[in-house]
Amino acid sequence: MTEVLHFPSSPSASHSSSSSSSSPSPSSLSYASRSNATLLISSDHNRRNPVARFDQDVDFHASIEEQDLRRRSSTDGGEEDDGGEDQISLLALLVAIFRRSLISCKSNRRELCSMEIGWPTNVRHVAHVTFDRFNGFLGLPVEFEPEVPRRAPSASATVFGVSTESMQLSYDSRGNCVPTILLLMQNCLYSQGGLQAEGIFRLTAENSEEEAVREQLNRGFIPERIDVHCLAGLIKAWFRELPTSVLDSLSPEQVMQCQTEEENVELVRLLPPTEAALLDWAINLMADVVQYEHLNKMNSRNIAMVFAPNMTQMDDPLTALMYAVQVMNFLKTLIEKTLRERQDSVVEQAHAFPLEPSDESGHQSPSQSLAFNTSEQSEETQSDNIENAENQSSSSEISDELTLENNACEQRETDFGKYRTGRLSDSSQQVVLNLDPPAQWPVGRTKGLTNLSRVGSRVERTEAWR
């Protein structure tokens, strides 16, 4: 964009033109020369940058118009007043500002459109490095590893006496989020047969051995062969050394007021999620111990007694002892509830998968009916003749009922003797009665034997063979 300015070539021409118009002032001539010089100097730069050239052209034209207005106002000073000059100059200034704002917006838009971020080139995947606060940098190349191996950063220096929030957590088989160290000690205890050890969680190991194993656990190592009583003691010590015990969020009054199983369950729901998960893990651990009561001599009361002092912290020893008794009853109730739920789940699974399908009318096959009759008879016989693990929890109740029924049957069966050599075969689920009568039946006993067909109940039929 070029503008040609015409200047007078000789003084005569300028003098002749002064009659028709006013001669240009020296200031206008100097301004024109400066403008031409500016155009000549910036021509090379404008040729390289079109946006800058466009901006300078607009600025130049705005300045030219402004100078023309000033020159006209100076030549026509007698014709217009000062108010008109101010309005014209203000209008010219506004027009120049408006044009400059439009031009700047257009130039910024063009610059943004011209700026495009391209895809990276010559990319090479060297390594994938992740950071774990417990294991440090994982996947770091060898050349970037420090020469001196340092310990992996961790939120805590030890695994005993620290909060669960600063420990590495894992999920157990029941979905409880508990510290990993507890799961490691539990697996080690189970693999070495700790549940079958007599007095587990009641007998203590030597202090020197426990301290040595504790140091190895703090360094992150699990010894291969550890005494099961040492492991049990460390599990109790972990709960005992917590900064905030599992049941500290509950007041002693709340625990003491719980008298029924439903109240205990409602109280467990008041625990925070972390403490509730730890309590559920501990209850299931104690329930696993109680299931081997016939080997380890630890029933629900004994295991609850040894765990109760580790579940709470109190300053007064006398108050702590009294409170531990209430905590023991609380834990004992939860353990028995867990054992009962396990037994019910086993029974439900047994009913969910019958041995043989029934026919369309709903009647069972003969072998299935015989199996059910056998199971019913086995529940009413003495527990010494049956080796079924599913009926161990209810053996005492069944034996009490059988005692009353046996007394009634013995009074009705005094007129004949009892000959029995029957045995129960658990593998075939059938009752095999081997009746070997004596060489000669006693006189007067045949009438009693014929009365067996008229015995109404199943119990009387069973007791008649005795």
From Swiss-Prot:
Residues annotated as domain Rho-GAP: 162-342
Comp. bias intervals (Polar residues): 363-376, 383-397
Keyword Mitochondrion attached: no
Gene3D superfamilies the UniProt entry points to: CRIB domain, Rho GTPase activation protein
Region (Disordered): 1-31, 65-84, 354-402
InterPro entries reported in the protein's UniProt record: CRIB_dom, CRIB_dom_sf, Rho_GTPase_activation_prot, RhoGAP_dom, RopGAP1-5
Ranges for domain CRIB: 117-130
GO annotation, biological process: signal transduction
UniProt feature, compositional bias: Basic and acidic residues: 65-74
Residues marked Arginine finger (site): 202
Bias (Low complexity) ranges: 8-31
GO molecular function: GTPase activator activity
Short name of any one Pfam family annotated for the protein: RhoGAP
Keywords in alphabetical order: GTPase activation
Organism domain of life: Eukaryota
Function: Acts as a GTPase activator for the Rac-type GTPase by converting it to an inactive GDP-bound state.
Identification of the protein by name: Rho GTPase-activating protein 1
